[in-house]
Design a protein with these regions (language model features):
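Extracytoplasmic "Venus flytrap"
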Residues: 34-53, 75-82, 103-106, 169-177, ...
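N-terminal export signals
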Residues: 7-26
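Beta-alpha junction/loop-to-helix N-cap segments that form part of ligand/metal-binding clefts
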Residues: 46-52, 60-131, 143, 200-207, ...
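Extracellular/periplasmic Venus flytrap/periplasmic-binding protein
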Residues: 86, 129-131, 138-242, 277-291
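C-terminal segment of N-terminal export signals and the immediately downstream linker at the start
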Residues: 1, 22-37
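Segments of small-molecule ligand-sensing domains
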Residues: 295-305, 316-372
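Periplasmic-binding protein-like
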Residues: 91, 95-103, 123-125, 167-169, ...
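Extracellular/periplasmic periplasmic-binding protein-like sensory domains
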Residues: 235-308, 370-373
Length: 374
């Protein structure tokens, strides 16, 4: 299905988010969710879009009478681990109820020890790194599938098409290495290895040497594990250098942001998705989401904002199911009781020993006129 890609207005920025959940108001004091994410810099669109999706859901809940408010306190980390760690320490010292919607692997890894130490729920980070999932942590809940799930699907598709010479362009940090590990694992199961490797530094778009290295290897396809600005720069420069192969990107790249950066050069670029398409009106979650979007002046939809919307919806369901008054422990218990539950046709399932809610992954393809094919 080919559908128009829609965008969240940037005008909303990263303002505090108010919302509520479906239990009787116990007190007037809101529950505070702390979020450290990129709201400036080369990864800013990811933080902005996720936050706006969460805001969309929580605001519509807050409009209902008798609901206790939930406030998201945002702090900008610019997608830098040190800033994220400092933000997280500040949020914990301010006694936030939970940490929610962190953006990225290196930043989430910087925050995780602090969250674990103080037993603060860490819910729905925007990352699929295995290093955040293993070993199991009682207070950490992942909504999305892992990067290993994404790279397994990429390699399966590529090898099915007879494309076996695969190069990897990756960010030189924990995120990039998590993606590289996933590609290497999936290729190894096919008795294959990457034909070339090249890196880019986090928050940089200096890709000249990486393009030279990878184009020289003449791969059939390039798997990209980076943020949207660097990946877009690599695609443009590789094509200028004469490369005619296929580019595969992981979901973290940000589908809308990558397409915006590339314009007509987006044609044929592949992106794995861990959320259902927000543009497919046959999907009940997409219909609910886009109906909510239509009610907000100037708002529109994308994959990252849908993930924020669903993450807030799942967290609220955990609060609804929480035994007794809302506490950190009762939120954990409430989330663990979400067992094979449908959220508009998207299944989320947690348990006492499983805190990964979904394994859903599918492929999408960008077009040169701003659309997404799923």
């Amino acid at each position: 299905m080919l559908l128009n890609r829609r965008h969240f207005s940037l005008a909303a920025g990263a303002a505090a988010t108010l919302g509520g959940f479906g239990i009787a108001r116990a007190q007037d004091t809101p529950l505070v969710l702390g979020q450290s994410a990129a709201f400036t810099g080369p990864a800013a669109q990811l933080g902005i879009q996720f936050h706006q999706g969460a805001k969309l859901f929580l605001d519509q809940y807050n409009a209902q009478p008798g609901r206790r408010n939930v406030v998201i306190k945002n702090l900008d980390d610019g997608y830098e681990p040190d800033r994220c760690a400092a933000n997280t320490q500040k949020l914990i010292e301010e006694d936030v109820f939970a940490l929610f919607g962190y953006i990225g692997t290196p930043t989430s890894l910087a925050a995780l020890p602090l969250a674990v130490k103080d037993k603060v729920p860490f819910v729905a980070p925007f990352t699929g790194a295995m290093s955040l999932r293993e070993p199991f942590q009682k207070n950490v809940f992942h909504l999305r599938a892992s990067y290993n799930d994404e790279t397994a699907l990429m390699v399966k598709q590529l090898t099915h098409l007879g494309l076996k010479k695969i190069a990897v362009f990756y960010q030189n940090d924990a995120y990039g290495k998590a993606g590289l590990d996933g590609v290497t694992l999936a290729l190894g199961e096919q008795q294959l290895k990457p034909v070339a490797l090249a890196t880019v530094e986090r928050n940089s778009a200096d890709v000249a040497q990486a393009v030279k290295t990878i184009v020289a290897a003449r791969p059939d396809a390039v798997v990209q594990v980076g943020a949207y600005k660097a990946c877009a720069a690599f695609i443009r420069e590789a094509r200028k250098a004469g490369y005619g192969g296929t580019f595969f990107n992981m979901s973290f790249v940000g589908t809308q942001a990558l397409a915006d950066e590339l314009g007509k050069d987006a044609a044929g670029v592949m992106v794995t998705q861990v959320m259902p398409s927000p543009y497919n009106q046959a999907n009940a979650l997409a219909r609910e989401f886009t109906e909510a979007v239509r009610k907000v002046n100037g708002a529109s939809a994308n994959f990252s904002s849908l993930e924020g919307y669903l993450a807030a919806k799942v967290l609220v369901e955990g609060l609804r199911k929480a035994p007794g008054k809302p506490t950190r422990d009762s939120l954990i218990a409430g989330l663990e009781s979400i067992d094979r539950q449908q959220f508009g046709g998207f299944e989320v399932s947690f348990s006492a020993r499983n805190h990964v809610g979904s394994k859903f992954v599918e492929l999408s393809m960008l077009t040169g006129d701003g659309r997404v094919r799923t």
